[in-house]
Amino acid sequence: MNPMEEVIIDKVVVNIGVGQAGDRLTKAAKVLEMLTGHKATNTLAKKSIRDFNIRKRLPIGVKVTLRKKDAMEFLQKAFYVKDYKITDYSFDKHGNAYFGISDYTDFKGMKYDPDIGIFGMDVAIVFRRRGGYRIERRRIGSKTIPNSIRVRKEEAQDFLQKNFKVTVVR
């Protein structure tokens, strides 16, 4: 295989959606910082929802984006929590994978803190090939990448099976 066609992990995004600003948001940020070692950033509401008392651009969640070595280390911990299993429908047609973790205390070494409470999180894994993706991101002469070059669902599943010993449950 051409080394530029090799599938790699572009990034891992860990998100906790709190649904409200305030004290719970800072506690969720603290949980993400304990798990990943990186500072969490706020996610903002896209539109106002009167019934939930949410205004547009109000911080309602926190997220951390991990790349390279940090992403691989976090995925080892996350797949341990999921018993090294991921469902087939967790992958989209471009090979990206998404799964949820119901409680942060499931991670190794994490204990329940009554001051923080219980928080679950969503994990998104974005795959790409080693070469060719700059074409889509560059400022001048940017083009869309054809589907033949994009990472397919089966390739992403093979990558996780080889590198993390994850079984894909169909």
From Swiss-Prot:
Organismal lineage: Archaea, Methanobacteriati, Thermoplasmatota, Thermoplasmata, Thermoplasmatales
InterPro entries reported in the protein's UniProt record: Ribosomal_uL5, Ribosomal_uL5_arc, Ribosomal_uL5_C, Ribosomal_uL5_dom_sf, Ribosomal_uL5_N
Top-level division of the source organism's lineage: Archaea
SUBUNIT field: Part of the 50S ribosomal subunit; contacts the 5S rRNA and probably tRNA. Forms a bridge to the 30S subunit in the 70S ribosome.
The species this protein was found in: Thermoplasma acidophilum (strain ATCC 25905 / DSM 1728 / JCM 9062 / NBRC 15155 / AMRC-C165)
An individual GO BP term: translation
Family: Belongs to the universal ribosomal protein uL5 family.
Pfam family membership, one: Ribosomal_L5
Cleaved signal peptide residues: none
Protein name according to UniProt: Large ribosomal subunit protein uL5
